[in-house]
Amino acid sequence: MNYLIVPGLNNSGPKHWQSFWEKSLPNATRVIQHCWDHPEKADWVETLVKCIQQLNADTILVAHSLGVCTTVNYLLKAKSQGGVPPYIKGAFLVSPSDVDNVELIGNFAPMPLENLPIPACVVASENDPFLSMERSEFFANAWGVKLFNA
């Protein structure tokens, strides 16, 4: 199994859990965006598309924060254009950014609210200062996936 790490705003530093997973998991790679601090939805989604097109083996998408919004936008775009590649087996969506309520990432709004075309889960926590559990539950329900409280 391969793992494609999809970081959020400002990437994930060396002590971030995504960086740890990238180093610890066999066959893990990271999406590298062109501009981490001034994200543009179309650019971020297109970069993810290009990374996915380079894959050729079963892969789990591991997204965090704005990377979740990028991943959800990609999945629904792919769904509407013939489907997600069969080697994309699932998505691990951690602490989605609330793009509808944060000015810096507002060009990602609105958050897509459709069932995802692949197995996925949302992982959130009650002490997340950026996203309430209620909002996390709202996203998970809209995407048709299970929510885990970490």
Residue ranges of predicted features:
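Active-site catalytic motif of lipid deacylating hydrolases and related acyltransferases
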Residues: 1-57
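Active-site nucleophile loop of the alpha/beta-hydrolase fold
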Residues: 8-9, 32-36, 91-101, 125
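Conserved alpha/beta-hydrolase "acid-adjacent" motif
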Residues: 14, 101-104, 129-135
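Conserved loop-alpha-helix segment in the C-terminal half of the alpha/beta-hydrolase fold
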Residues: 22, 126-146
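Flexible "cap/lid" loop of the alpha/beta hydrolase fold
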Residues: 40-45, 83-84, 93-116
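Gly/Ala-rich beta-loop-alpha elbow adjacent to hydrolase catalytic centers
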Residues: 61-72
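Conserved hydrolase catalytic core segment
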Residues: 73-90
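Short beta-strand/loop motif that positions the catalytic acidic residue
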Residues: 116-117, 121-124, 128
